[in-house]
Amino acid sequence: MAIAGYAIGASQGYIYVRAEYPIAVQRLEIAIEQAREYGLLGKNIFDSGFDFDIELRLGAGAFVCGEETALMTSIEGNRGEPRPRPPFPALKGLFQKPTILNNVETYANIPQIIVNGPEWFASMGTEKSKGTKVFALGGKIHNTGLVEIPMGTTLREIVEEIGGGVPNGKKFKAAQTGGPSGGCIPAEHLDIPIDYDNLLSIGSMMGSGGLIVMDEDTCMVDIAKFFLEFTVDESCGKCTPCRIGTRRMLEILEKITKGQATMEDLDKLEELCYHLQSNSLCALGQTAPNPVLSTLRYFRDEYIAHIVDKKCPAG
């Protein structure tokens, strides 16, 4: 972060971390204090004339504060709600000053790029997505945990070689990438090279690197409902499309899972998805439909079975 500050001429940085992570908070406090003691932070760092310091700010765990403008609003001491853009943070951000925001993974790459050179970093990955990506691998998989892979690695390699495959002899059914707002990727796309563009093209996204594996016993309608329940709870309520739209979508999904829906409900659900994508204020509402749209795209037969046959094909 200090390197980024030097590059753009900033003198103050903030690390925003959830208060529910006390170990992370404690370690960051120690690291910041040690950096000050070593002269890596503060006034006139190494007699360079460059001043830079870092403050730690704790968040209350709101999912919407992962959106950059809501995060800045929270750091300022206000309720974490997104702001309209423009103006963009690079022109008018934290405390009305020009601001850049990056996640920890981005900053962690900077020292290695400086030490090894940009060519080294660009030698990994794909043409448009350079370097590596860290995924949190979980779900119905033998080996769970954090895995770092070069961009362009296939989903099959992650699931079968790194993750050790699906346990108990079950078949792979889908993987959801990008956290609660990501899409579900079916087995037909197991061999697609993972990068930002490819994930978007098949209805998912990279996000911060969540990767959840599902087996043949997973009900994809239940999965869509599960993630939408989370989004409903985490919506800040500032804009109507997200505040009301997600609730209407959840009501329809509940009818479908109970065998009480009609095919007209399915059409309405899809219509609401596109409405949220187009009209929500921030990325939380814009991406909330991804789990629904991706499961409709690849597992529509399961929705129809719930509606017509009043039962779940996955059991």
PLM region descriptions:
Residues 20-25, 62-65, 71, 79, ...:
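Flexible loop/turn segments at secondary-structure boundaries
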Residues 14-18, 48-57, 171-178, 267-268:
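Beta-strand segments within the central parallel beta-sheet cores of soluble alpha/beta enzyme folds
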